[in-house]
Regions:
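A transmembrane-helix-recognition feature enriched in membrane-embedded lipid enzymes
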Residues: 1-55, 103-107
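Soluble catalytic domains of membrane acyltransferases
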Residues: 48-148
Length: 148
């Protein structure tokens, strides 16, 4: 992967975050729009800059479903966000402190868990889902945890 692609990807994360901030503050739809627009940008720029083609196949779930996926790279999250209408991830707790990424993740309803504490993570994840505070949508979990 080229350094130029990685640089522009992080630069555009900040740009998209700032551009969509007013809409994301007003409502969750604005946050989804920001996240999806950024995902489309990354997919397009990956194809244009490094020749990475991506394809989404099959029926895209629209209701409240659980999607279990294998976490191979940053790109699998990009593909899922660009495909499903209301994605929300189970994400490691430290990501909520990441500038732009963390705030928008929380805004779309991502659920944070402590990665190293398996039993506690499962309990807090189930409690968060059952609380009803998380918005409706597609819950994405990477059962293996981190990317390989």
């Amino acid at each position: 992967m080229s350094a130029a692609f990685v640089f522009q990807m992080y630069l555009m994360l900040v740009v998209f975050g700032l551009l969509f901030l007013p809409w994301a503050l007003i409502g969750r739809r604005g946050a989804y729009l920001a996240v999806r627009s950024y995902a489309y940008w990354v997919r397009w720029s990956a194809r244009w800059m490094v020749g990475l083609r991506s394809e989404i196949r099959g029926i895209i779930p629209e209701g409240e479903v659980l999607i279990a996926a294998k976490h191979q790279s940053f790109f699998d999250a990009i593909l899922i966000v660009s495909a499903v209408p209301k994605p929300k991830f189970i994400m490691k707790n430290s990501l909520k402190y990441a500038p732009v990424l963390g705030w928008f993740g929380l805004r779309i309803g991502c659920i944070c868990v402590e990665r190293g504490k398996r039993t506690q993570a499962i309990k807090s994840m189930v409690a968060a889902v059952n609380s009803g505070n998380s918005p409706a949508g597609q819950l994405i979990i990477y059962p293996q945890g981190t990317r390989i």
